[in-house]
Amino acid sequence: MTGNNNSDDNSNSLKTKWGNRFIIAAIIQGGIITGMALGTVAFQLLTTDVDIIQFLSLSFEGPAKWFFIGIILYLILIVAIATTAVFYNHLEINLKRKFSKVSNILAWIHLFGMNIGGAGTTILMIFAGLAGSGVLSLFVEGKLGNQDVAILTSFIPYIAFFIVILSIGVICGGIAYIMAYRSKA
């Protein structure tokens, strides 16, 4: 085709390594939450005694809110990772900025920190909500357990640990972005 300069076959086509990495990460994270959702639906289909989502919805004032907040934050994380890919794409393609050795290291920390810290935080919140609401007992023992608000306290240090990893990743990403933005095209 004439006039189409965006073909992958074109050796002069522009590429974005960091944009691609973050898009792939967003796709993987989307796959993880899809797997979690399908697992919950499959378990619900096999367990007709309790409507898991209805139970969690009715007990939203208790530990179950951690489940829903974890799910919502996980979805926000996926959108944030994809949005980050757009920022890196803008730097690498539109502004034609190059990453130095240091900014590459910071971008790697950003990628891992955002994905490990963000996913760890949200998955632990989801798990804490299931454990504290008694729904986890349904998966493990086959019967609905008692609600236990105190169990949430045991998750706080681990959630905080993953939040620190997430924060370090995002801060390093911001520094990498500024360094690349200020570099010459």
Located regions from the model:
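N-terminal juxtamembrane cytosolic/stromal segments of multi-pass membrane proteins
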Residues: 1-23, 185
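Hydrophobic cores of alpha-helical transmembrane segments in multi-pass integral membrane proteins
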Residues: 19-96, 106-184
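Juxtamembrane inter-helical linkers in multi-pass membrane proteins
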Residues: 2-5, 98, 142
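Membrane-water interface regions at transmembrane-helix termini and the short interhelical loops
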Residues: 12, 96-98
